[in-house]
């Protein structure tokens, strides 16, 4: 099944529509200023400045001048290690502008149209001026030394940046019908396809994304070269002799490349290892290639990796990446809450991976995991004001420790106004603005609803309107009007709802779906009652021993201290009723009182108290400086 184009979807959901409008009205104008280094107190971006420097170098060369040469041997460049006219920032700095453009393409229909349209055109002009004559586009090498391009695929990010360029171009073409950025992306893709492939130059991205993006370009343009090059990158990755060995002039056993998921062929990988974002981007690209090439072995490998993530490494919030060391996956069932990394980009990548596997094999589990990641980690990575963001998303935080303990330095207690490594803020913006494309799918005979998302959708079968009251209440109405032809409706029933009803009667699920033949305009009134649930971990997750997490509907909740001396002093009475009130869960519990001694033979005094849980996506927005998803219980 293929996703319905976001061009035909208007999100009206009470949870997501305000967030999309915030992206259009606040987030994107704010990020535009950041990219121009115009926000006082925010880390310097240098993104736009780099494009302008590259354009100047290209123009000077065309006029017969010489191009200056600067070092291209670093991950990060600043005024301490580089000259003023050289490239500044991270090697992937270009991608921030591309993600901004993609988010703008999706956000324009929801507000601030004139501003976003004008700035998008300005951005495209900036990018066009920085493209080399042969289509190559990466400001680091255009500024610092074009002769060194494609010489360090392992560490530097030319192909990764291209991936975001191509995705932005596809979004702009799809949503606005503008070819300008698509033409730029196709010229860049043609340069890559001429360079890499069978009988050409070997190699593959150190940071995956080009694979998925090339498939997306193929889906938009129909140009087979793009699919073939994506397939080449996937098939040759990790094969012997190892390309990264050849590139570096060494001979290793491949363990150095676990971080890049390039230690062995993807079809031989059975566990998710290495950098979490790179991993899910690679898996999404591989699943996309498998879909279009019919490579069953590759599809099976992707499913194996999915099962490893889903069963042993996925946080209850939909976060991925257990350790800050390498921003990486950890061992099975190692899911620390306080040291969790859970990069926002990893949850976004998990959604991409879920979508691509769903397209290969429509299974309810993919939509369920996408919902978990979107409603909890992705939604919580951006503040209500649209100007502050989380990079890491631990499931437990203590203000003093987060500020002073080295192992927690990666965990900002509060959302930040920007980062010098700013991959997450524009990523969250583009996923939020484009969320509709992950919710609705169709083939010749079937319309599938995979996310509980309020929206108006123009489908091949007629007009679909979904009126949702989630997550506040369970009312979920599906209206089909202007029917063009009969079809089969497949509605994924939320796995958190034990007793879904249709017109007051219990719904019978078939593999997680409500299925009905639609032959006439109709209205289906479902109720997915968002009851409170206690969640327990597999016993092998040591960090959660003796603890429970609370959820209501699709939202995971976090306990805040409300003045208690420590989050660890609070215990939930799991036998008492839990009340939902004003968006929070209230429960009976106890607070242990500290004494004068670090250790004592007397048990601490337990004082009854009321515990307050808020949605994880709204955590630490006020004065609170401690929170925990998994809490001790009296059981």
Describe the function of each predicted region:
Residues 144-220:
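A conserved hydrophobic secondary-structure block that centers on an alpha-helix together
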Residues 497-517, 532-540:
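Solvent-exposed beta-strand/loop surfaces of large extracellular or lumenal domains
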Residues 291-312, 335-387:
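Catalytic-core region of carbohydrate-active enzymes that cleave or remodel glycosidic bonds
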Residues 60-64, 80-97, 148-161, 194-207, ...:
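Solvent-exposed loop and edge beta-strand segments that line ligand/cofactor-binding
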Residues 16, 101-114, 163-178, 211-222, ...:
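Well-ordered alpha-helical scaffold segments within catalytic/enzyme domains
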Residues 13, 20, 24, 32, ...:
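Hydrophobic core segments within long, regular secondary-structure runs in both alpha-
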């Amino acid at each position: 099944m293929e996703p319905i184009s976001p061009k035909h979807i208007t999100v009206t959901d009470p949870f997501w529509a305000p967030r999309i409008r915030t992206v259009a009205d606040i987030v994107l104008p704010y990020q535009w200023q950041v990219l121009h280094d115009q926000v006082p107190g925010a880390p310097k971006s240098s993104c736009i400045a780099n494009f302008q420097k590259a354009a100047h170098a290209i123009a000077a060369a065309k006029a017969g001048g010489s191009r200056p040469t600067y070092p291209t041997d670093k991950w990060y460049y600043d005024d301490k290690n580089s000259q003023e006219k050289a490239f500044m920032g991270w090697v992937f700095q270009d991608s921030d502008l591309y993600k901004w453009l993609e988010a703008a393409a999706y956000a324009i229909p929801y507000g601030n149209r004139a501003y976003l349209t004008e700035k998008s055109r300005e951005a495209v002009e900036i990018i066009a001026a920085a493209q080399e004559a042969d289509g190559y586009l990466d400001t680091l090498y255009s500024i610092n030394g074009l002769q060194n391009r494609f010489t360090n695929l392992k560490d530097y990010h030319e192909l990764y940046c291209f991936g975001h360029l191509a995705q932005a171009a596809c979004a702009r073409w799809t949503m606005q019908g503008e070819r300008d950025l698509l033409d730029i992306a196709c010229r860049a893709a043609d340069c890559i396809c001429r360079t890499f492939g069978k009988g050409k130059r070997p190699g593959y991205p150190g940071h995956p994304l080009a694979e998925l993006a090339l498939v997306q370009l193929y889906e938009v343009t129909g140009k087979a070269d793009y699919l073939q090059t994506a397939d080449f990158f996937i098939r040759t990755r990790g094969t012997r002799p190892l390309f990264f060995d050849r590139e570096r002039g060494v001979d290793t056993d491949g363990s150095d490349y676990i971080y890049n998921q390039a230690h062995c062929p993807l079809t031989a990988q059975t566990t998710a290892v290495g950098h979490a974002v790179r991993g899910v981007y690679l898996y999404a690209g591989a699943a996309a290639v498998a879909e279009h090439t019919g490579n069953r072995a590759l599809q099976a490998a992707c499913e194996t990796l999915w099962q490893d993530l889903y069963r042993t490494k996925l946080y209850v919030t939909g976060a991925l990446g257990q350790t800050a060391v390498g921003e990486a996956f950890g061992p099975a069932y190692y899911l620390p809450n306080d040291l969790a990394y859970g990069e926002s980009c990893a949850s976004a990548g998990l959604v991409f991976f879920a979508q691509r596997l769903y397209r290969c094999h429509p299974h309810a589990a993919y939509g369920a995991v996408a919902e978990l990641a979107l409603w909890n980690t992705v939604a919580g990575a951006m503040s209500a004001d649209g100007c502050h963001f989380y990079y890491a998303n631990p499931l437990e935080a203590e203000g003093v420790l987060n500020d002073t303990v080295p192992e927690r330095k990666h965990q900002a207690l509060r959302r930040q106004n920007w980062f010098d490594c700013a991959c997450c803020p524009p990523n969250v913006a583009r996923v939020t603005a484009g969320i509709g494309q992950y919710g609705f799918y169709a083939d010749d005979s079937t319309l599938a609803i995979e996310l509980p998302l309020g929206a108006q959708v123009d489908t091949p079968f007629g007009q679909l309107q979904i009126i949702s009251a989630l997550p506040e209440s369970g009312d979920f109405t599906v209206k089909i009007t202007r029917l063009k032809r009969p079809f089969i409706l497949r509605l994924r029933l939320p796995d958190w709802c034990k007793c879904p009803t249709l017109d007051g009667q219990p719904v019978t699920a078939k593999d997680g779906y409500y299925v009905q033949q639609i032959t006439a305009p109709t209205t289906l009134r479902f109720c997915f009652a968002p009851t409170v649930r206690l969640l327990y971990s597999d016993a092998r997750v040591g960090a959660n021993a003796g603890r429970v997490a609370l959820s209501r509907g699709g939202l995971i909740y976090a306990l805040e201290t409300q003045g208690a001396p420590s989050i660890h002093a609070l215990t939930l009475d799991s036998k008492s009723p839990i009340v939902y009130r004003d968006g929070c869960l209230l429960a009976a519990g106890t607070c242990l009182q500290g004494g004068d001694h670090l250790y004592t033979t007397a048990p601490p005094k337990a004082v009854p108290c009321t515990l307050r849980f808020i949605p994880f996506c709204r955590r630490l927005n006020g004065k609170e400086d401690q929170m925990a998803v998994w809490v001790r219980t009296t059981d």
